[in-house]
């Protein structure tokens, strides 16, 4: 049934053809079940394990590696002699890498619990219905409830469907619907229609929503919608329709993979075609087929060389280390790739309650009457420090501390706050904080009483647990609460009837203490309290009181005001009818006005600084709240989102105002606005969508079930540690301390991680460029193989992998939060950097080939062949006079490969030092700024020595131990790469860098 809230109870009953007293007939139940289906949320069909495994092989680079492994495997079958074992090592290692990668990928996907499944926890098991086949109420499974059913709910029940209330069977009906609307206090419900068909859920005061809890009272209602038709069902559908986009880094790596795979394919084909003339060379036994296979193997080696196999592992490690650092700052990251996305966040959409504010209501102002002289009324105004539930703070008058016990009016005000109250404070020893027990508003009054300490109770020697309610206990010992007249909507107040305790010798009789909305309470006051006397409440005095309340309730503070009053001579208890709430109004008359307290949910202390940090970092903060617009704008001014006197006409909207704009203007509003008030969850998703259309990277906070679709849609969904399981499972990050400042710290960490990742991705890629150049040169010049695939795999995975991981520990730049967010479209490697890495890669390739050639041409223990013999080694036979006196086996010796590999590894270690900073010289940023990098270089070199000097590794890798002369040659060839990169950095710093960047550095 659509818009049930706007219809009368009679219309709702008529729509389903049902009687409130008897309920649906079995026939109607059957028909409605067929029409509307079961009252449950359908489970989401997850991917099968096999589908997840297949998904891991959709990446182009992975497919190329898989193809290379298969080809290597086939070629290994054709190997002869002692080469057979080494031939199988390469495909085996590649397959191991791919399997490990797939396992990690599948594990991560499986671990991301399903937010839709988490919604199930809000589905109640049972419901109580009236049906025509039974005289009394019956308990049935909640899934069998159908639209039209007459349902009964009572305190403690979970609402089984979306229900239009027909009758309230208690004084009041309070519902905790925070999971759905984010309202921190329970909501009082009624039965009258809400005539606005577009009312937001917060305003549908005659509806009960599926999954919410009855906090107090008992009611009867008719089921309007079930299953996916409910508000919680709509949230489920929104979440199911939201596709997870790839993070900017994943997109960059995908693009890079595609480009790389095209380049690899071209080079492999080129190498094979260049050497067609050599297929018949004698070294292949004159067999064209064997020649083709040989060059095919070289092409495969090229593919292996060009792909940075270690990259996925290094990225995962770097992100995992980042998440550990973030966890120490109270940001728990649930999805690894989102660590990097945080770095390009350009907009943070934050909830107000609990994130920007403490979510701990606190009284910050109060007033009592000081003097009434004719029409002149003077007030005593006080301010109170302390913005949490902790009983710590001072009462100030004109900014100077005062002792509240010296003011009779404050003693009475404290008495009303303590007695007209069902809440208390509790010290949570595990967390070391004071928490509320009961309603937030009442707990604020309890805390106020503790801060005022009107009877000067000695609290210094008390433990924190005893301190929690010490001053309230003193007041409760003086007066005994007899009974409570519950809050009701018509009078907007509640009261308690108290009698003096036996032990108290004070000459006071019974009293009624009242608290409630100022306009309602003051209208029923005939007197005002001045000191210990009461004087009549005249028109001018009332105007003065209401003027102050209006001033407090608007403007910068927008405080929530409560009026406190006493009925000095209430009727006798036996004369009062307590089971008829309609008569409570007549008992709460002839009141004496005592004072007013103004409270608010105060901003967190550290938020203002964090918002300034965001402004410096080019990040826009948008506050989104269910509160009214005035309160929202006031908090924005208080924390620095808006300036003190800034005009906010086109920068703050309510959900209704936003909906009334044409679509183009809605989109434009999202570009400007910094405050959205009175919003529904659907608005959050819409705002994210519009921001994404401007290529903004959005972080969205939320804690309720209602926030889950927007959390899932935003690039970074941030759930509160105190939030619902659904919000947490739909998000990428959870704030353990619910604090906005933690988001800013996480963004800073994300930026640092991206900078470091850029360094090691470039480091690994320049290494691969070097390997490709090496293989291409040997093939193009007709030289013997300098590096074989198994050696390339070792370098890519192990010796390069360790320094690359250590580069993730580079310290962040000092000005990291003074720059605007990077564009998600910014390429990983720009034009100049591409040239730089080609230059370095070219040197690496040439040096590696040069080291192998040096052994053939000049080494003492080498064959001393000439250059022509070296480039035509394929034609070497015993009969060929050009190779007279040369053993043809020498061209397959392991020494030149060892020289080439050692040069490659040493250059890579130098390159790792070059990667400490993109443009800073090693003289400005010495190696010891990252001690992890030095350690990893030592470890990589140790592993290189291991495969050179420890049997049987040299046989597997086709290597031979080097002597001192050869090592000196390796260093001579390798070290110039540092000088080359220093020259390139110098050019970048002085001739290419943006002057703005220069100034910032």
From Swiss-Prot:
Which Gene Ontology terms describe the biological processes this protein takes part in? apoptotic mitochondrial changes; calcium ion import; calcium ion import into sarcoplasmic reticulum; calcium ion transmembrane transport; calcium ion transport; intracellular calcium ion homeostasis; intrinsic apoptotic signaling pathway in response to endoplasmic reticulum stress; maintenance of mitochondrion location
Broad EC category: translocase
Record EC number: 7.2.2.10
Q: Where is the active site?
A: 351
Please list the residues that bind ATP.
Answer: 353, 442, 489, 515, 560, 625-627, 678, 684, 706
Catalytic activity line of the entry: Ca(2+)(in) + ATP + H2O = Ca(2+)(out) + ADP + phosphate + H(+)
Q: Which residues are Mg(2+)-binding?
A: 351, 353, 703
Q: Which residues bind Ca(2+) 1?
A: 304-305, 307, 309, 796, 800
* Annotated region (Interaction with PLN), positions in chain: 788-808, 932-943
Q: How does it sit in the membrane?
A: Multi-pass membrane protein
Keyword Ion transport annotated: yes
Q: How does it assemble?
A: Interacts with sarcolipin (SLN). Interacts with phospholamban (PLN). Interacts with myoregulin (MRLN). Interacts with DWORF. Interacts with VMP1.
Name under which the protein is recorded: Sarcoplasmic/endoplasmic reticulum calcium ATPase 1
């Amino acid at each position: 049934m659509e818009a049930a809230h706007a219809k009368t109870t009679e219309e709702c009953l008529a729509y389903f053809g049902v009687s409130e007293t008897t309920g649906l007939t079995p026939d109607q139940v059957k028909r409605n079940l067929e029409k509307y289906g079961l009252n449950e949320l359908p489970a989401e069909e997850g991917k099968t394990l096999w589908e997840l495994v297949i998904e891991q092989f959709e990446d182009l680079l992975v497919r190329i590696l898989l193809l290379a492994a298969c080809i290597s495997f086939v070629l290994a079958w054709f190997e002869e002699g002692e080469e057979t074992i080494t031939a199988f090592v390469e495909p085996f290692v590649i397959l191991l890498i791919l399997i490990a990668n797939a396992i990690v990928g599948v594990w991560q996907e499986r671990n991301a619990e399903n937010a839709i499944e988490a919604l199930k926890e809000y589905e109640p098991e049972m419901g109580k219905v009236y049906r025509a086949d039974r005289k009394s109420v019956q308990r049935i499974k909640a899934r069998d409830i159908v639209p039209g059913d007459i349902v009964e709910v009572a305190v403690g029940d979970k609402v089984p469907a979306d229900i239009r209330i027909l009758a309230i069977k208690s004084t009041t009906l309070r519902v905790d619907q925070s999971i759905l609307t984010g309202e921190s206090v329970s909501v009082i419900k009624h039965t009258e229609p809400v005539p606005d068909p577009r009312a937001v859920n917060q305003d549908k005061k005659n509806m009960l929503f599926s999954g919410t809890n009855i906090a107090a009272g008992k009611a009867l209602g008719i089921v309007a919608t079930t299953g996916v038709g409910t508000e919680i069902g709509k949230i489920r559908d929104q979440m199911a329709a939201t596709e997870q986009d790839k993070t900017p880094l994943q997109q960059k790596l995908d693009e890079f993979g595609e480009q790389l795979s095209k380049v690899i394919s071209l080079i492999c084909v080129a190498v094979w075609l260049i050497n067609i003339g050599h297929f018949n060379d004698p070294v292949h036994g004159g067999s064209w087929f064997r020649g083709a296979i040989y060059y095919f193997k070289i092409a495969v080696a090229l593919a292996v060389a060009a792909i940075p196999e270690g990259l996925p592992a290094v990225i995962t490690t770097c992100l995992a280390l980042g998440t550990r650092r973030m966890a120490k700052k109270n940001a728990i990251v649930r999805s690894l790739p989102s660590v990097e996305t945080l770095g390009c966040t350009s907009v943070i959409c934050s909830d107000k309650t609990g994130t920007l504010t403490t979510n701990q209501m606190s009284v910050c102002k109060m007033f009592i009457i000081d003097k009434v002289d004719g029409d002149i009324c003077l007030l005593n105004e006080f301010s109170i420090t302390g913005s949490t539930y902790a009983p710590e703070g001072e009462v100030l008058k004109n900014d100077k501390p005062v002792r509240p016990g010296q003011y009779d009016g404050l003693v009475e005000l404290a008495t009303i706050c303590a007695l007209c109250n069902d809440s208390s404070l509790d010290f949570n020893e595990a967390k070391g904080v004071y928490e509320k027990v009961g309603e937030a508003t009442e707990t604020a009054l309890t805390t106020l009483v503790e801060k005022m300490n009107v009877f000067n109770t000695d609290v210094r020697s008390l433990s924190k647990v005893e301190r929690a309610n010490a001053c309230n206990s003193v007041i409760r010992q003086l007066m005994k609460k007899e009974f409570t007249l519950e809050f009701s909507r018509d009078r907007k107040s509640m009261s308690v009837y108290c009698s003096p305790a036996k032990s108290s010798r004070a000459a006071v009789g019974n009293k009624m203490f009242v608290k409630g909305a100022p306009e309602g309470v003051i209208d029923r006051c005939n007197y005002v309290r001045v000191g210990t006397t009461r004087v009549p409440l005249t028109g001018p005095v009332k105007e003065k009181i209401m003027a102050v309340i209006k001033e407090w309730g608007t403007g910068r503070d927008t405080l929530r005001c409560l009026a406190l009053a006493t009925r000095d001579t209430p009727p006798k208890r036996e004369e009062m009818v307590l089971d008829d709430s309609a008569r409570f109004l007549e008992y709460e008359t002839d009141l004496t006005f005592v004072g007013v307290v103004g409270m608010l949910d105060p901003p967190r202390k550290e938020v203002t600084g964090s918002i300034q940090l965001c402004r410096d970092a080019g990040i826009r903060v948008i506050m989104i709240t269910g509160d009214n617009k005035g309160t929202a704008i006031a908090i924005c001014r208080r924390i620095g989102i808006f300036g003190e006197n800034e005009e906010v006409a086109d920068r703050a909207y309510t959900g209704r105002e936003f909906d009334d704009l044409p679509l183009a203007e809605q989109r434009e509003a999202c570009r400007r606005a910094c405050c959205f008030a009175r919003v529904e969850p659907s608005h959050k998703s819409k705002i994210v969508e519009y921001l994404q259309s401007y290529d903004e990277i959005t972080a969205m906070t939320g804690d309720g079930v209602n926030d889950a679709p927007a959390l899932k849609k935003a690039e970074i969904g941030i759930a509160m540690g105190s939030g619902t399981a659904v919000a947490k499972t739909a998000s990428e990050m959870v704030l353990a301390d619910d604090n906005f400042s933690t988001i800013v710290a996480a963004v800073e960490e994300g930026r640092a991680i991206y900078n470091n990742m850029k360094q090691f991705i470039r480091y690994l890629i320049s290494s691969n460029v070097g390997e490709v150049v090496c293989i291409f040169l040997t093939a193009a010049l007709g030289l013997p193989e300098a590096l074989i695939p198994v050696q390339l795999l070792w370098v890519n995975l192990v010796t390069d992998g360790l320094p690359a991981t250590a580069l993730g520990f580079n310290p962040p730049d000092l000005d990291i939060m003074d720059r605007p967010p990077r564009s998600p479209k910014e390429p990983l490697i720009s034009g100049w950097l591409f040239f730089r890495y080609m230059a370095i890669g070219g040197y690496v390739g040439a040096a590696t080939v040069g080291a192998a050639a040096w052994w053939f041409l000049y080494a003492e223990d080498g064959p001393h062949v000439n250059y022509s013999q070296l480039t035509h080694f394929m034609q070497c036979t015993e009969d060929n006079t050009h190779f007279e006196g040369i053993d043809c086996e020498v061209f397959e010796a392991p020494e030149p490969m060892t020289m080439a590999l050692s040069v490659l590894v040493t250059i890579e270690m130098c390159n790792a030092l070059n990667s400490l900073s993109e443009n800073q010289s090693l003289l400005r940023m010495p190696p010891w700024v990252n001690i992890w990098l030095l350690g990893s270089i030592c470890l990589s070199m140790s592993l290189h020595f291991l495969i050179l000097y420890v049997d049987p590794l040299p046989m597997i890798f086709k290597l031979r131990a080097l002597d001192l002369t050869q090592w000196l040659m390796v260093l001579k060839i390798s070290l110039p790469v540092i000088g080359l990169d220093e020259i390139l950095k110098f050019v970048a710093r002085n001739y290419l860098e943006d002057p703005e960047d220069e100034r910032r550095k």
